[in-house]
């Protein structure tokens, strides 16, 4: 599921985060931050979000059954200084058997969007949708069945890691050129989403330590 989440609802994310030259932490997953996060457009209901912590710090747990919604921030990230997104995440219950590049199966147990504003309206936004796939191999990518302005890119898969914490990294600047054919110097925001409104299945996932780095 994507529909117009990035294209039309990202403008509702009006929160900002601290930025420095070496590292940009996007989400702290604290009680204070959670109270201020904006929920994006809801699809047949809202994902349940629960804060928690472990030996490596704070995380947020997402649960969705036949529904979906996202949390996001508008933050200007200089990709010439910090082009790499780093994500630590885990999928406890995946969406086995769905066809993720179809409208009926376009759900993900975990996904992280990076968004670039490329025009004067929200409809012109471009996005890369980094996903924790339930059915595809790492490195696979395809346009969203709802809009070609968002590309799904598999960074993790439950075929290799189910109910296991995984840390991944991607060069966002290079990925925008490879997937969208555009050279971007910065991005405009980041959002997370767990959704199952198309498949009607249940997903449980966790997000932790999402930040941008120089290398």
Tell me the role of every PLM-derived stretch.
Residues 88-94, 117-119, 173:
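Solvent-exposed strand-to-loop "edge" motifs in beta-rich extracellular domains
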Residues 107-112, 148-149, 155-158, 162-202:
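Extracellular beta-strand ligand-recognition surfaces/modules
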């Amino acid at each position: 599921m994507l529909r117009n989440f990035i294209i039309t609802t990202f403008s509702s994310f009006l929160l900002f985060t601290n930025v420095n030259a070496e590292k940009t932490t996007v989400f702290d997953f604290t009680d204070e931050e959670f109270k201020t996060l904006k929920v994006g457009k809801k699809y047949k209901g809202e994902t349940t979000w629960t804060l928690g912590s472990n030996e490596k710090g704070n995380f947020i747990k997402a649960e969705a059954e036949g529904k979906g919604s996202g949390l996001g921030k508008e933050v200007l990230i200089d990709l010439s200084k910090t082009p790499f997104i780093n994500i630590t995440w885990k999928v406890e219950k995946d969406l086995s058997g769905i066809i993720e590049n179809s409208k009926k199966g376009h759900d993900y147990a975990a996904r992280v969007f990076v968004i670039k504003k490329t025009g004067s309206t929200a409809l012109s936004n471009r996005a890369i949708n980094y996903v924790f796939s339930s059915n595809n191999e790492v490195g696979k990518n395809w346009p969203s069945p709802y809009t070609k302005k968002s590309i799904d890119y598999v960074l993790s898969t439950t075929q290799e890691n189910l109910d296991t914490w995984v840390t991944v990294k991607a060069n966002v600047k290079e990925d925008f050129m490879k997937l969208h054919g555009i050279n971007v110097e910065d991005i405009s925001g980041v959002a997370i989403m767990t959704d199952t409104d198309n498949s009607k299945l249940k997903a449980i996932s966790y997000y932790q330590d999402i930040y941008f780095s120089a290398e």
